[in-house]
């Protein structure tokens, strides 16, 4: 701090400013008021705004030193340092909500120099500095804006233009709180009762953002209420649609049942089905007795095998009307199953007809073959009963034993014929 104070005379560019090294708190407002006066138009220094900013910081740090040395007799107020008491309140056009908007009426304690630097470099002041730099409509700032905003003839520059203590004071004829374009925030980080008119934003969005009580309902609550209302309406509509759909399904089901019953009980339909069943049964090569016995294989509850006469009476339409109606779905199920099996047989003839056309050659083991040769030596032409007994004893099929005896006789005949000739 002392190094900055020692460099202070080298950066004093305003001829109207006196050389105050440690101005008092009462004279600091007068010095700041003189510092905020517009720059002479013929000044050739291009870094006037930077010089003003450095000068303002040096004076503020000097005021802090005096406040610390004097103790609690002169409590330091950041707002009192950077704002005059008779400054004109500015209505802010910015709607950016402040990060800390707490109204407290007690005085601040004396700040240390490090605290003041932290206070100057806080994010809220950076936000206000950016907003102050945006107020170019009031007159345009210099090349290097200070923490207070745009420094120039028309802009609110230096400590008065939204400095470390907050926003508010106007700087120059065209300044007035950031100019007509309004780049300055209307409130400070720590507003005081005398800045009450500057600290409030009249925009409803800003009031909502600052969590201030408002007469308007919260948009989230409105959206939630609308969402729940829409969900309830949708649920009611869905329930109504489900009820209507169930009623329509019941009506359609009843109509379908009535149509099915009508088609089943129609005598002409029964007659046409009986004729069609007879023709398809004959085409399949199945007798009426086979149909009656095959009905038991369908495993329909309450349905067993039927006699051949029942199938014949159905085809000739001599059964009663109720029996015809009861027998029609059973015969239709059998007919569909028989036709399906016939189609599979036609599609794969090698599986069904191959076994019948080409029978696998039978192979007899050696022990059974020796036993058969012994029986053949005793009796080359056994009777049918003897062949059955031999087959049962050797655990062979009767037809296999019969064919073996026949083949063995033919073999013996060929052997005798070859020996003779």
UniProtKB/Swiss-Prot annotation:
Coiled coil location: none
Sequence similarity: Belongs to the POU transcription factor family. Class-4 subfamily.
Gene Ontology molecular function terms on file: chromatin binding; DNA binding; DNA-binding transcription activator activity, RNA polymerase II-specific; DNA-binding transcription factor activity; DNA-binding transcription factor activity, RNA polymerase II-specific; DNA-binding transcription repressor activity, RNA polymerase II-specific; GTPase binding; RNA polymerase II cis-regulatory region sequence-specific DNA binding
Gene it is expressed from: Pou4f1
Feature: DNA-binding region: 357-416
Chain span(s) of sequence motif POU-IV box: 57-66
The keyword Cytoplasm belongs to this UniProt entry's keyword annotation: yes
Domain POU-specific: 262-339
Protein name stated in the entry: POU domain, class 4, transcription factor 1
Alphabetically ordered keywords of this record: Cytoplasm, Developmental protein, DNA-binding, Homeobox, Nucleus, Transcription, Transcription regulation
Result when mutating residue 378 to I: Abolishes transcriptional activity. Increases transcriptional repression. Disrupts induction of neurite outgrowth and expression of synaptic genes. No effect on transactivation of BCL2 expression
UniProt-annotated stretches for the region Disordered: 94-117, 133-200
Entry function: Multifunctional transcription factor with different regions mediating its different effects. Acts by binding (via its C-terminal domain) to sequences related to the consensus octamer motif 5'-ATGCAAAT-3' in the regulatory regions of its target genes. Regulates the expression of specific genes involved in differentiation and survival within a subset of neuronal lineages. It has been shown that activation of some of these genes requires its N-terminal domain, maybe through a neuronal-specific cofactor.
Tissue: Expressed in mature osteoclasts (at protein level). Brain, peripheral sensory nervous system and retina. In the adult nervous system, predominates in the medial habenula, superficial gray of the superior colliculus, red nucleus, mesencephalic nucleus of the trigeminal ganglion, nucleus ambiguus, inferior olivary nucleus, and peripheral sensory ganglia.
């Amino acid at each position: 701090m002392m190094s900055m104070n020692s460099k202070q005379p080298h950066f004093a560019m305003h001829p109207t400013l006196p050389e105050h090294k440690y101005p008092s708190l009462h004279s600091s407002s007068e010095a700041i008021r003189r510092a905020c006066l517009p720059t002479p138009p013929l000044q050739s220094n291009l870094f006037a705004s930077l010089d003003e900013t450095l000068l303002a910081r040096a004076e503020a740090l000097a005021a802090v030193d005096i406040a610390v040395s004097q103790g609690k007799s002169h409590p330091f107020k950041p707002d009192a340092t950077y704002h005059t008491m008779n400054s004109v309140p500015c209505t802010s056009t910015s709607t950016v909500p402040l990060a800390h908007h707490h109204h407290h009426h007690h005085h601040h304690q004396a700040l240390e120099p490090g605290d003041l630097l932290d206070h100057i470099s806080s994010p809220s002041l950076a936000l206000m500095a950016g907003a102050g730099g945006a107020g170019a409509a009031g007159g345009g700032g210099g090349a290097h804006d200070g923490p207070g905003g745009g420094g120039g003839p028309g802009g609110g520059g230096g400590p008065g233009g939204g400095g470390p203590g907050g926003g508010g004071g106007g700087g120059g004829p065209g300044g007035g709180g950031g100019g007509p374009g309004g780049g300055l925030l209307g409130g400070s980080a720590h507003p005081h009762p005398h800045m009450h008119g500057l600290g409030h934003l009249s925009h409803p969005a800003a009031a909502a953002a600052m969590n201030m009580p408002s007469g308007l309902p919260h948009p989230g609550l409105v959206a939630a209420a609308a969402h729940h209302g829409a969900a309830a309406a949708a649920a009611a509509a869905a329930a109504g649609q489900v009820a209507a759909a169930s009623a329509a399904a019941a009506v359609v089901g009843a109509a379908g049942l009535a149509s099915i019953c009508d088609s089943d009980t129609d005598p002409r339909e029964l007659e046409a089905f009986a004729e069609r069943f007879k023709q398809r049964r004959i085409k399949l090569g199945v007798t009426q007795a086979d149909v009656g016995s095959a009905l038991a294989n369908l495993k329909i509850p309450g349905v067993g095998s039927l006699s051949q006469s029942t199938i014949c009476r159905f085809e000739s339409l001599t059964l009663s009307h109720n029996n015809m109606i009861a027998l029609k779905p059973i015969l239709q199920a059998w007919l569909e199953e028989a036709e399906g099996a016939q189609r599979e047989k036609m599609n794969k003839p090698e599986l069904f007809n191959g076994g019948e056309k080409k029978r696998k050659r039978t192979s007899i083991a050696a022990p059974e073959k020796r036993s058969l040769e012994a029986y053949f030596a005793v009796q080359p032409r056994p009777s049918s009963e003897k062949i059955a007994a031999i087959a049962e004893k050797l655990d062979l099929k009767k037809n296999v034993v019969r064919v073996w005896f026949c083949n063995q006789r033919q073999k013996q005949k060929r052997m005798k014929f070859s020996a003779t000739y």
